[in-house]
Amino acid sequence: MSTAHLPSAASSATPCATPPAARPAFPTHPAAVHPAVHPAARPSLEPPAQPQPKPPGRLRRLAVALAAVLGGGVLVGGAVVSVYAMHSLPKLSGQTTLAGLSAGVSVRRDQADVTHILATQPLDAYRALGMVHAQERPWQLALNRRVMHGTLSEVFGPVSLPVDKLIRTLGIAQAAQAQWAGLPPDAKEVLQAYADGINAHMASGAQADSPEFKLLGLKPQAQAAKGEFWTPQDSVGWALMMALDLGGNWGTEFARFSSAQAVDTAALWQLFPPYAGEAPASATDLAALYRSLGVYATPAQAAKASEAGANNSMLASENGKFDSEKTDPASSPVASLQQWADGLGHVEGKGSNNWVVAGQASASGQPLLANDPHLGLSAPAIWYFARLQSPAGQGAQAAHAGLDVTGATLPGLPFVVLGRNAHVAWGFTNTNPDVQDLYLEAINPANPAQYRVPAPAGQTAWADFATRVETIRVKGQPDVSHTVRSTRHGPVLSDAQASHAQVMDTSRFVLALRWAALDADNHTVLAGLEGAHARSTDELLGVAYRHYHSPMQNVVAADTAGRVAYKAAGRVPTRAPDNDLRGVAPAPGWEARYDWTGWIPYAETPEARFGTLASSAMMQPATVTASASPAVDTGVASVSAASATATAAQPRHAASDAQAAASAQAQQRGWLATANQRIHAPD
């Protein structure tokens, strides 16, 4: 997961969040205009006279009148929709109120669409960040929350049931609640302030609901008034969803498992090759292992499961069409959500780039840091650029340090994910370690409510599945009860993935998932909050990011002292020496040797604190050109991907020249705010 840092005002190609004013307007369709023809311009040869038509009959007159009314209605309706859409845009200037503030807050949006929040108390800054996220990204927040809670079907209908079942099975909401419970009080206060800012704005009625809410018949104002539009636990859950999106390989494990019934191990590793120059991680004959266990479905079972899957897919496809008799046109986003869900567990080909250059190797004498994200395109953008400023907390907020941090935020999270403060800059790319393992769980033939667990040699032992029933509300249909089973390893994916029954005999075996990110001690959110206050690369990587859990990231950092550093931050499991599968394919869950044995200590994950680093490839320091932002003079040049180039022949002085040119251009433009807003607590 990575992104460009704070965009420079001098760069016209800055990758930033779409300005609210640039939201696409509804198209208009003016009537065709034909040029007038003067009688003198007509041809001299007149056409034969035509008989005059009879006066229109009653039905025809009625039809013409109705068409005129309908046509006018369409024009009026289109005008009403356009006016409503404009009314739903946020008010970005003037005065507004926000419940819960201890003092006034200033919000300024600059020409690069970076939102600057200046508060007198830290929690007010976080509350204001929640407000501006709600102002500009209300539907994005609402949709994200429905995804992680598995409530899409409530508004989109049965087409989204597979996604809801998968998310409910993973237990994202339950894991988020457990992780929230383990956070320290000051972190909980920040998450609460952020959620309060979102809910207060949505409940205020300061702007009309965006069209998505109207199309789906949703009432976010009432939900926000109860504090339920966004909760502190939702921020923890959204961090989990990012870990799910960027850190998984269960799909690849299942693909190897499925392929092993048709090809031998040598061919299997040709289909799923290891890293170049490396041997396969496991030498186990997977085909022989799974045949000996008898896990695969018979042809009859596979055909039956495939037929059921095809019927379900056809139903979902039909429900997803733009057909008013079957579903709402607004259900079109579900197709992309289903594609996203189908792609979970496959991270090959995903990646990013970051570079950091020590001050001693740059012409300016200051370090350079660039971050190039390789995340999918979306509308609205996944990132929201912001700067949060506040002195240290006073009175009831005395536990909170001051803020001056700038960079890319994620709507739903109350901190800068990638960016810089007055002392240090940082960037991420995805490390992609193996933090997910699938386990074959054998079902007790005498009691299907039990599964096999490790036992002394020569003995067999069983344990009960942990179960819970999830009720999924479905638009236009009765509620669906979904039973979630879990083993000592984790949730049973086979209960939510129809493809499993097409490959394996699910009456005798199921697949359970062990995923590091679901553990209750996942405090990635805490790392993000504490990173904003780091004063050096050592504090960032050695203190704040010790809390970082999932998804593991290659973190590069630079500070005002000229130091640069790299650290693989995150939690990676250790496996026993006799674990011959090494996590590449589903393992027999009743054999203890396949269980995780612990975690790689944070001090032992890869790191470096010297020289010039590049996460994709080593390069000469002079190959990076940077545009520095005049907004914060930290001595650390934070480079946006759009303004960074790599050319081997580039002279060493190019970086300083580019900085000088960028600074001059920014001064010429004046770094003027495009919108100013003053927020205060209601009287």
Model feature map: region roles:
Residues 2-59:
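N-terminal Lys/Arg-rich, disordered targeting/topogenic segments
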Residues 54-72:
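N-terminal Sec-pathway targeting helices
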Residues 67, 75-368, 373, 379, ...:
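Substrate-recognition/specificity elements adjacent to catalytic centers across diverse enzyme folds
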Residues 118, 126-127, 238-240, 365-366, ...:
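Short helix/loop capping segments that flank catalytic or ligand/cofactor-binding pockets
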Residues 177-184, 368, 520-530, 683:
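Glycine- and acidic
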Residues 398-480, 531, 590:
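Compact, glycine/acidic-enriched structural inserts
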Residues 436, 493, 547-683:
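Hydrophobic alpha-helical segments
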Residues 524-546:
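Alpha/propeptide regions of enzymes that mature by internal proteolysis
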